[in-house]
């Protein structure tokens, strides 16, 4: 056998090993200098034919010492030496004169191969070891497991000679611990394993990679502190560790990496201060540390980084000021310090960085103004100062930024006008100045910015008209001036904007007629203005119009022909106008999804053709003058999901064909004249969630088939003529089993059968209504006892059984009913005494009405002092004993009782000074009892009283003087007491000696006569007193009016008594006329846990710094949110609504009614409304303050790294349940209308809570109204309404789908063309929207690449992500009917949260590492 030379193999790269025919073997020539490689081949030696895993690959080289024809390669490879290996076959030794030369060459060959042999053999073994360690990636590393592929030809492996110099396994989903075999390749120069899903910690043996220059470990799950050995790799030039879970402090040893040009460690959990040693890296060009937990100030040593081009430190906890030494970074191109805690002014030195192209300082605690020197940054393309607490005026020098493309200055507190110099920004494409504090007029110079595509000036105080010069902005796509004070006509020239797709002019003071609209307009919103006249037909001259919102104006005329040309119209919202005529039939031919004609003057019958529409999902025709019957044709509208025709004049029976509407979820026909029995076919609509047929003339029994409506959670049949017994089958729909898909902590279930003629007993099966929250059976003919089974309803908050014929005890159950807040049992035949332990049985009781029964005994001690009780009525009973006003001495908190009526009983004894402890009492009625003694002066210290009736008792003595100073008191009656005296407050004022003389009940006139002089003096004195009294009264009345303007009561929504206290009072205390006794105002406190909190406007002003921008924490579609700390230390969020005083003009009760409804919403995934205020034109809402900010902040500006997949999935599930509760669980159902990540707030433990639903359009039950409607947010708007807001539940579903995609991808809902250029071509797909981009990627088979690279996921978690992505894509379907309901979304996400992990089903490829400068 010819001599063999063993060669350790490192897989040659394709460039070094050529096919046999080409004879390229240049990489192997060096060891054979002066010789010629004449051929090569591959051998495969195994111990058996089936043992393929132990195959070894050999290189066969055929050489010839002398020049000449190459030796022929053998037909078969020789047997391997030693059971395998690689070899070189040499020709046999010559027999002639070349023998000496032959042996010399052979010796030289051996010397050259000896060092390479050992190294190559080691690398080959390491490659096979590495392959074994990552065998899970066999499906992605195909040629690693192909026998015919040399190791150096394996994908991602690069060799020089036979030595491995580069490993690139990026975007290969392996999901194993970091393979230690990698560190065995000692000649490695480049290592890229980004996006491999590696976990664990880096080994200290990293020090072995002494030749490493490029290290990319991004997009994995690696954690722990960085090993100290990493900083000994002194040849390292690029280190990329983004999107991992590394923690600990950044070691000062980083100063050893003096060759470093790129350091990118973003989106980890590094903490502590930035080491000053970073400033010693003189070659550093790219530094990215964003989204970590670095704290402290920016080291001054950073000024040494003179070569730095890119510095991104956003989303950390950096404090201090922006260091002045930053001026030394003369080559800086991008600076991003956003979302930190930086303070102080923007340093002027920053404006010396002449190469700066992008400056992002948003979301910091900066102060001062934008420096005048900002105009020196001539290369600036992006200036983002959003939410920086900046004040003063915007400098004129802003106009010097000639190539600026994006200017973002929203959510600041600028003063004055937007400078005219902004018109010099001829390259400006986006101007975002929302809620920035600007006043004055919109600068006409903006018309020079002809490249503008986005102009957002909403939420300011701009006045005047829209400048004519803006007509030149023909490139504009989005124009938003909502929520200002703009006036005048909407200009006609807007129809010349050929590229605009969305125009929002809502909530201004525009008047006059509607103009024509641009041809390519998709969305037009002009609600809440003063537009008048008829709607012109030319409004439909464009063929792209999909959404038209003109509600809350003064539009008149009919719509007989108006919208015939709107061939793509999907939403038409005309509510709250003065339109008349009949509803036209052509509406059925339009692709409408939502039609809202409520609150107009439409007459006639509902056209039958409307029921033939193939697209419509929601119809609202409430509050018109429609007549006739609902015909059987309604059964043709199979797609219908919601129908509301409340408060019209419809007659006749409900059509039987309504049972064909199997998709119907909400049916509300209250306030009509419908008659006859409820058709049994109605109960075929098995998706019904809300059924409201109240306020009609329906007769007959409640059908037992109601049990078929298993999804029902709202049933309102009140104010009809229904008779018979309450069917026990009713509770099938309200059982936990029927609603198991929505695991609400607080369920919502409403049964309202009040004001009918129902008889019999309350069914004992009521305990099966386990999701029931409110039960209203008042005003019927029910008999028997209160069923003890009510105590099993653990979620019940309100029970109203008043005005029936119930007998027996008040509380038949001894166990606590912790959730019950309102119990109304008045006007029955209940007997016995009030249990002494009632406070323990009803621990959360807020309203207790036991009046009009036959109760005896005494009032339990401490009942009046119970911390939760606001309203107590025990009038018209036979209760005796003393009224227990005295509380325990250790009670320090204010007594929350607001309303107390104990009249017409047998109470005795006297009132003592302890009544002064009831500082919140507004209504006190104790008339017709046997109370004795003197009236305590302490009663005058209950300054909140406005109704006081102590008549028909046995009081004696005087009326306390202090009562005359109770300016809030509007009714007081002391008549019918001892000695027959009849005294009113007018008597108090008219008594001798001034306002408060000793006016005893038994007082008699003096006997002695007056002398003439004395009489004269007395008359003069009396006249002076009268004049002074008149002056005092005028002063006090004016002061009182001022106080009314300045003071309000923070009312837990639902508290009508307190709301009535806010209304203007018609009588003053000094008795200009005597008020007649009136019924106490109705109140509803039953759904609130806390007593009202009294604050004044002044206190709110102080708490918000006079609504200073520094207190702004956000801005919603209808107002600005301020952080405030009330007296007593409670932190709240105060939402100051924009321009809604006019909206509720003449209807404060309407505003209150809406807030009453919203205030009842309580769910752990919703931000609760604590109170509200209507003071003049101001409207304030007070919410619980959420310390941890919003989901948007966490994902893009405040800690996204802290949100791993488990946290994101929990947020997704919780938010879904909150929205599902609004859609399906609360009555009246609430459509959010502005679902977005900034409206998902994070509470303790990152518990998600959906906010801003309090301003959503409310679809109410019997006594509802139509309320304000929020505008949606760009990027979250469903396609059927283009860039505007939706008013259907399916619109909320679409928006929530976008939020789900944000959670999955970490991307914003939209991005600009400038951002696309920065990111790369992949970002162009989808047209700049997140939904479009996900579809674009999926269509190209790259769906697995959409996930956020920073998500720390395992294989099982990746499957969860894939399933959530499926749900999100269903939610964002173009067709609304293809989208699931929120109930279904919550169920599916809940199932994903609880899923058992199966095999990995989705392969994920992360994106490329960040581009290096």
Swiss-Prot record:
Class in the EC hierarchy, top level: transferase
Taxonomic superkingdom: Eukaryota
Chain positions carrying an annotated carbohydrate: 153, 192, 304, 317, 461, 496, 499, 554, 568, 601, 663, 697, 768, 795, 878, 901, 917, 928, 973
Membrane-spanning residues: 1016-1036
Active site: 1234 (proton acceptor)
PROSITE patterns: PROTEIN_KINASE_ATP, PROTEIN_KINASE_DOM, PROTEIN_KINASE_ST
Record: residues binding ATP: 1113-1121, 1135
GO molecular function, one term: protein serine/threonine kinase activity
Record's subcellular location: Cell membrane
Purpose of the protein: Receptor-like kinase that may play a role male and female sporogenesis.
Name under which the protein is recorded: Leucine-rich repeat receptor protein kinase MSL1
Organism encoding this protein: Oryza sativa subsp. japonica (Rice)
